[in-house]
Curated annotation (Swiss-Prot):
Catalyzes the isomerization between 2-isopropylmalate and 3-isopropylmalate, via the formation of 2-isopropylmaleate. InterPro entries: 3-IsopropMal_deHydase_lsu, Acnase/IPM_dHydase_lsu_aba_1/3, Acoase/IPM_deHydtase_lsu_aba, Aconitase_4Fe-4S_BS, Aconitase_4Fe-4S_dom, IPM_dehydratase_rel_enz, IPMI_cat. It comes from Psychromonas ingrahamii (strain DSM 17664 / CCUG 51855 / 37). The keyword ATP-binding does not apply. This is 3-isopropylmalate dehydratase large subunit. Pfam families: Aconitase (PF00330). Its cofactor is [4Fe-4S] cluster. Heterodimer of LeuC and LeuD. PANTHER family: 3-ISOPROPYLMALATE DEHYDRATASE, HOMOACONITASE, MITOCHONDRIAL-RELATED. CDD domains: IPMI (cd01583). [4Fe-4S] cluster binds at residues 346, 406, 409. It comes from the Bacteria. Binds 1 [4Fe-4S] cluster per subunit.
């Protein structure tokens, strides 16, 4: 019987399947940060329960950490979350990369850097973008705080089995189109509910040809398509990325793991519940115009009008988004000015992203009135970028070079938009208020963000660079 990769991982981790109710899966790895863990630890304490397997957990501080140096945190709630995580991890013997640790950074960037997740694993984290780790052929779920507590106590997760959605992206990407553009183009077609009830497997030449960093970007955005998780079959790129890393298997264990990992890709002829095909050459650099990742067009496109939508709900959503974003139907995206440019986040905070942006910035200076901040996703990313001289390129162009953290992806750490400010952001969500009260967010790739900082507005980098 042929199986999809999702079915193989599911079957290997199924602990119990009741006649009614949710099946129970074994969890190999549990990732933690300071925002969704305090209540879970408190729940364990109230029930006099411990953590079942501390070696399965890796923790970091990322959401609330300041990026303008590691000064004292001014927000008392954020400071309390940071302090509480340090106390909880010390009490339970959990490996924590705190703000002073040389490995500190965003959880979904730190974890792959150390080879903590492997193909075929089930991984959980109290964070929506846990789907990032699907780039390694890992079934990775974002979970709620009560589930964080349950996983800590039992190393299991109650989970309904999802349907399977295969998204093929065949062919070769056009110049300056990236994994971020693939993700946004997919969401633009399927909508943010298109993947609801599914686990997505991304496949096709364009996906196979992505770097591991690009694959992480693509899987990171699977949740924005409504999917429970995103997966990419492990291959030689995956194995090369993991080999020699701190938590990767060694010696005979590596050989055994490698043999198992090679069995994970979906069998030829495996049956998916749904299949969607894309042509890579049709995917241009993307930019969102509205307040949802699905409200996205090619950079050379025209902002739609409510009358362009047959669905009355989407038409109303368009009307609302145009009003909030202060742009007009029929407007060219290349005529939209930006105030702030943000490079970073668990979507685009890796070394590849900083290289792409730096390539655009060489010998140029940001436009008058534009603020641009570069926030590496981890200290290892920051150190690598500085070793390559990328920090100097950013600084010479007028950008700010910050310390690692989630930063302006969400308004929780001092990095945020003020009312009415418009950003070009490499993060993953453009909801109302996501980057600050009444802030206006446009999602783009790193190269697109860098170009916008120079021009002062969005540009079609295929012609501009």
């Amino acid at each position: 019987m042929t199986k999809t990769m999702y079915e193989k991982i599911w079957d290997a981790h199924l602990v119990y399947e009741p006649e009614s109710g949710s099946p129970i899966l074994f969890v190999d790895r549990h990732l933690m940060h300071e925002v969704t863990s305090p209540q879970a630890f408190e729940g364990l304490k109230l029930q006099n329960r411990g953590v079942r397997n501390t070696h399965s957990i890796l923790a970091t501080m990322d959401h609330c950490v300041p990026t303008k140096g590691r000064a004292e945190i001014s927000d008392p709630v954020a400071a309390k979350q940071i302090q509480t995580m340090a106390v909880n991890c010390k009490e339970h013997g959990i490996n924590l990369y705190d703000m002073s640790n040389a490995n500190n950074g965003i959880i979904h960037i730190v974890v792959p850097e150390h080879g903590f997740v492997h193909p075929g694993m089930v991984v959980c984290c109290g964070d929506s973008h846990t789907s990032t780790h699907g780039a390694f052929g890992t079934l990775a779920f974002g979970i709620g705080t009560s589930e964080v507590e349950h996983v800590m106590a039992t190393q299991t997760l109650q989970q309904q089995k999802s349907k399977t959605l295969l998204i093929n992206v065949e062919g070769t990407l056009s110049k300056h189109a990236t994994a971020k553009d693939i993700a946004l183009a997919i969401i633009g077609k399927t909508g943010t509910a298109g993947g609801t009830g599914y686990v997505i497997e991304f496949a096709g030449d364009a996906v196979v040809n992505l770097t591991m960093e690009g694959r992480m970007t693509l899987c990171n955005m699977a949740i924005e398509a409504g999917a429970r998780a995103g997966l990419i079959a492990p291959d030689q790129k995956t194995f090369d990325f993991l080999e020699g890393k701190e938590f990767a298997p060694k010696g005979k264990d590596w050989d055994a793991a490698l043999a198992y990992w090679k069995t994970l890709p979906s069998d030829k002829g495996a049956d998916f519940d749904k299949v969607i095909n894309f042509k890579a050459e049709d995917i241009a650099p993307q930019v969102t115009w509205g307040t949802s990742p699905e409200q996205v067009i090619s950079v050379n496109g025209i902002v739609p009008a409510p009358t362009d939508f047959d669905d009355p709900i989407k038409a109303q959503a368009c009307k609302n988004a145009l009003e909030y974003m202060k742009i007009k139907a029929g407007q060219k995206m290349t005529d939209v000015n930006v105030d702030i440019v943000f490079l970073g986040s668990c979507t685009n905070g890796r070394i590849e992203d900083f290289r792409a942006a730096a390539e655009m910035l060489k010998g140029k200076t940001i436009a008058p009135g534009v603020q641009a901040i570069a926030v590496p996703g981890s200290y290892p990313v920051k150190e690598q970028a500085e070793a390559e001289g990328l920090d100097k390129i950013f600084l010479d162009a007028g950008w700010e070079w910050r310390e690692p953290g989630c930063s302006m992806c969400l308004a929780m750490n001092g990095d945020e938009l003020t009312e009415g400010q418009r950003s070009a952001s490499t993060s993953n969500r453009n909801f109302e208020g996501r980057q600050g009260k009444n802030g206006l967010t446009h999602l783009v790739s790193p190269a697109m963000a860098a170009a916008a900082s120079i021009a002062g507005h969005f540009v079609d980098i295929r012609d501009w660079a």
